[in-house]
């Protein structure tokens, strides 16, 4: 368990660091950012799983490797979820409103009917709040850890 929390902590801090640097540079809109995050997640899960295998005299079953990768992703995602909650609640709450407005503009510009845009936005606004977003971070990063492992 300590192994998972250590590597999960490294993963979480790495993702938070990337997010903060991009925020300070004003590059949060860049589309390539998600690919950098995926690469970091994959690399840290790989290195963490290899370290676990090494600590077990070079023997690691498929199930142990899978649980190590998912565990690392889960513990990392908990840190990122906490950061997400703090960021959108206290650091830059206006950014969330900007995202919602941009999403609405994109829907109107794509030719979506007004009624459908309104219905979609009503649903989106319920989930685009710090709490639900943080929960989605945990779910999505843990699932991604499962896929990568």
Regions found by a protein language model. Give the residues of each.
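Polytopic transmembrane helical bundles with strong interfacial aromatic enrichment
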Residues: 5-9, 88, 137-141
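Membrane-helix interface/capping segments
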Residues: 51-65, 89
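Alpha-helical transmembrane segments of multipass membrane proteins
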Residues: 14-22, 44, 76-80, 84, ...
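Alpha-helical transmembrane segments of multi-pass membrane proteins
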Residues: 2, 6-10, 67-76
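Transmembrane alpha-helical insertion/packing segments
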Residues: 1-52
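Membrane-interface interhelical loops and short interface/amphipathic helices
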Residues: 91-129
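Hydrophobic alpha-helical membrane-insertion segments
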Residues: 72-94
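Individual transmembrane alpha-helix segments
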Residues: 123-146
């Amino acid at each position: 368990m300590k192994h998972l929390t250590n590597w999960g902590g490294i993963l979480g801090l790495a993702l938070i660091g990337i997010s903060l640097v991009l925020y300070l540079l004003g590059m949060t809109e860049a589309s390539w950012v998600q690919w950098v995050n995926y690469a970091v997640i994959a690399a840290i899960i790989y290195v963490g799983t290899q370290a676990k295998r090494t600590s077990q005299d070079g023997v690691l079953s498929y199930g142990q490797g899978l649980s190590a990768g998912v565990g690392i992703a889960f513990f990392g995602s908990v840190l990122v979820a906490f950061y997400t909650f703090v960021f959108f609640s206290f650091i830059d709450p206006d950014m969330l409103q900007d995202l919602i407005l941009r999403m609405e503009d994109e829907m109107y510009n794509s030719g979506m009917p007004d009624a459908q845009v309104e219905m979609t936005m009503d649903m989106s606004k319920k989930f685009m709040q710090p709490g639900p977003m943080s929960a989605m971070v945990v779910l999505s990063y843990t699932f991604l850890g499962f896929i990568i492992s």
